[in-house]
Structure formats: structure tokens, C-alpha cells
Amino acid sequence: MLIPRRVKHRKQHHPKRRGMAKGGTQVAFGEYGIQALTPAYVTNRQIEAARIAMTRHIKRGGKVWINIYPDRPLTKKPAETRMGSGKGSPEWWIANVHPGRVMFELSYPNEKIAREALTRAAHKLPMKCRIVKREAGEA
């Protein structure tokens, strides 16, 4: 599970979910990638589920890159608690993903298997996604 080792502040404000991604919008490491089309909070468990879905489908011979990291805590108050008495305790770690962000990248020799692996991973994520391929002119 991806969580930060230590943080300066245990609790943070909720991040905003508006606007487009400022960086990380193109495939940089692999040949194929999953790009977000809608904004969402992605938890550390969802990132891990997507990674497992990809790696199990490609078995061996491919490489996976994860370009997002859950560095924001989300808090929750216990059930049946009255209002007030402070902010709840941290429950999840999330990555705030904006539209256009390439979250996962994959390098695999067979395009059909690579696309199927990315499709399986996209089903584990809480937003609409599309599969993008590295352009010929990109680094």
C-alpha cells in the first residue's frame, strides 16, 4: 500500500477537484498509458488494485510505471457522532487527479495484451479514463 512515511501535518484541507492537469499529461516512460478524463480522488487501495490487475494480465516481460502518489489524508468522523468536537481522524490517503493526467504507464511488446491490461486497470479506478499511446515524436 502506498502511504507517506511521515508528513508535516496529520490533517489537511480537502483538495479542489477543478481545472485540468498542469503536468504529466503525456506518456513519458512506457509505450501506453491510462489518462484521466474526469477529476477524482484516487485512494491508495485503488492504485494498488489497478497495479495488480495490470501485472497479473501481462505476467512477465512488461514494465509498469505509477505516476500518481497518495500524499493527501482524508479524514472521517465516527458513525453516530454529534456535530462539532473537531475534525475526524485520517482514514484514507488519496491522490487528487485532474483531467488529462496520465496515471499509469505500461511497456509491453504486444499492443493487444497491453491495451487489455490497461483496460482492466481502468475498471478499478473511480473516473472515466482512456488509453493513450506514445506519439512518434515524444521523447
Curated annotation (Swiss-Prot):
Pfam families with a match to the protein in the record: Ribosomal_L16
Amino-acid biosynthesis in keyword set: no
Biased composition (Basic residues): 1-20
Region (Disordered): 1-22
Swiss-Prot/TrEMBL keywords: Ribonucleoprotein, Ribosomal protein, RNA-binding, rRNA-binding, tRNA-binding
Example of a GO MF term: rRNA binding
PROSITE patterns assigned: RIBOSOMAL_L16_1, RIBOSOMAL_L16_2
Family, as annotated: Belongs to the universal ribosomal protein uL16 family.
Protein name as it appears in the record: Large ribosomal subunit protein uL16
Species the sequence originates in: Streptomyces coelicolor (strain ATCC BAA-471 / A3(2) / M145)
Gene: rplP
